[in-house]
Amino acid sequence: MFISTNLKKLLIIGFLVEALIFVCCYQMTDNWGEIFRLSARYSGRLSLIIYLICFFHFTFSFIKKKSSQKLKNSLIVFCFLHYIHFIFLALSVYLNDLPIIPLKLTGGFIAYLMILIYPLMINMIKKMIYHFIFYYYVGIVFAATYLSRIQGNFEGANPETFHFIGLGSIVASFILFTILIMRFQEK
């Protein structure tokens, strides 16, 4: 598979940012469980930002009715970085002996599968509804995660200002991008 120079640069920058997150968290504490918990927290925030960039690129690719290399690149970067986040998260759960609740895990598991598969299949998907399902489902999983933290239902993560910002940015992007897509379809 041919990887463009721009994509390589984005992947390297993304990896370096994830490494910087880990190093900063390593400097904050000497407890490995806490290091990976903090790394997962900040890596997840980075993933949210990249997801919103992907959703932005998708919306404008849809409006222009043409495939965008920026969209494909941002999706590959999102997939790559979100799997680094998954490693941090899995190690945090393991090292901190956090309980695994299968019902809550199912939604996230499906989202991770979609994040892995979608960048590989984006060019093969002809029905627009499947693209919408990807963006809205992954966004809903992000939103549910932040809402759970805000409500205090997430062990090891007290409510923070960023949780409100994260949830608000997801809701705002859903509203804005849905309006843009619907207006375009009316024309």
Feature annotation, model-predicted:
Residues 1-187:
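Membrane-embedded alpha-helical bundles that constitute the cytochrome b-like, heme-associated redox core
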